[in-house]
Amino acid sequence: YRNVRKNKVSKKSGTNHRDILDISKMSIEEVIEYVRKRLENYNPQPVRRKEIPKENGKTRPLGIPTIEDRLIQQCIKQVLEPICEAKFYHHSYGFRPNRSTHHAVSRAMTLMNKTKLHYVVDIDIKGFFDNVDHSKLIKQMWSLGIQDKNLICVINKMLKAEIKGVGVPNKGTPQGGILSPLLANIVLNELDWWVSSQWEAFPTRKNYSKIRTLKSGKAYLDHSNKYRAMKESTKLKRMFIVRYADDFKIFCSSYEDAQKIFIATKQWLSERLHLEVSPDKSKITNLRKNYTDFL
């Protein structure tokens, strides 16, 4: 309840015209009992659709569940988040505990300046939140260890909650739901690890990594020897991904490498996640000659 109340959307009412102030009139015991009974045979209430204006003149659809459904989504999030955090890629920064846009930008600057990766692949996923494949998402949750069938059934019902004035969606996870950012990270976590497996997480026979200590006393794993050995003994190309929600960049060392990973990533997103890339918003940038927007 406290986490829902902190959310700026908490004072916005759903289709039943109730908000967080109505929930605050209930005792803790009443809230717990309400959630328990709803989950016994859960059916979400219709979602309110609201169009949010964008700078380019277009609008972004926001799906606002009822306050009661947001409360249940928060309960589920608090159970799932620790499980997912243990499996998420370490350079994904969006909507995660103790991570922010500053961390994402700092990582991007490190790759550009210290690692000398001056070519960046910018890929914009067309309408990401509106095009998430429900069946694929459920399979990804199962792979992460979320295998309680009752819980999966509840989440599946949330995904297919009726949007008032639109109907029942067959894909997508509406922006405005408390659970949506976590589900988005579950979907794109597979992309993170796929890109990482091409270089950063590529397995080697010998363990080259060493534990080193910063002046601050913080320990970290140094992979520089591993990367040096891979560069000398393989034809693999250096590449690193930095992601914040559905906004991500892949850093490469040459234009040729960037072209290959650009084509491969578009194909992978289409075949694995059934997502399309916006051709007019996706490009390769030489950072020594041009700038790139991030967040």
Language-model features: where?
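Residues immediately flanking
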Residues: 15, 78, 123-125
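Conserved polymerase palm-domain catalytic core
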Residues: 46, 90-91, 96, 103-287, ...
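Charged boundary/loop elements
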Residues: 2-9, 78-91
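Non-catalytic, polymerase-adjacent accessory regions of viral genome-replication enzymes
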Residues: 1-29
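Short alpha-helical scaffolding segments that buttress acidic/His motifs in well-ordered protein cores
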Residues: 1-4, 75, 154-159
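Amphipathic alpha-helical blocks
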Residues: 22-44
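Short acidic, Pro/Gly- and aromatic-enriched capping/linker segments at domain boundaries
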Residues: 1-7, 284-295
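Hydrophobic alpha-helical hairpins/lids featuring a short glycine-rich hinge
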Residues: 53-57, 61-80, 86
